[in-house]
């Protein structure tokens, strides 16, 4: 019995050690989590939300980020634009399969006084290759402060 309990405890510890906050999230839930960790300026959590290689198509310019050590979002650049926080106005799952989803996200960015700086609709391709949803690519029709492009 002691060996069984010890084995069970080790299994729980190992599964917790490899757990990701987005493990049980739906594609829509991932988008809410994404904006939450962005607002928290939690760079490690943000990087874990992205799948690498990561693709961005912003205002017609394609950027590929291969290295997960390179931040996808430039928080300092975002702050220089006056950004303090973002909110989601609408999330729509346009298509979803077992390991892929296409999301339409309408969001706003605000300054510290609550003034809306930007309202935009952006499209996200999600993948579940690692067992949990991640953002594989972002497609934006306009330029976005804080979004790295080469």
Give the residues covered by each predicted segment.
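Positively charged n-region of N-terminal signal peptides that target proteins for export
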Residues: 1-4
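Hydrophobic pocket/interface hotspot
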Residues: 34, 46-47, 54, 103, ...
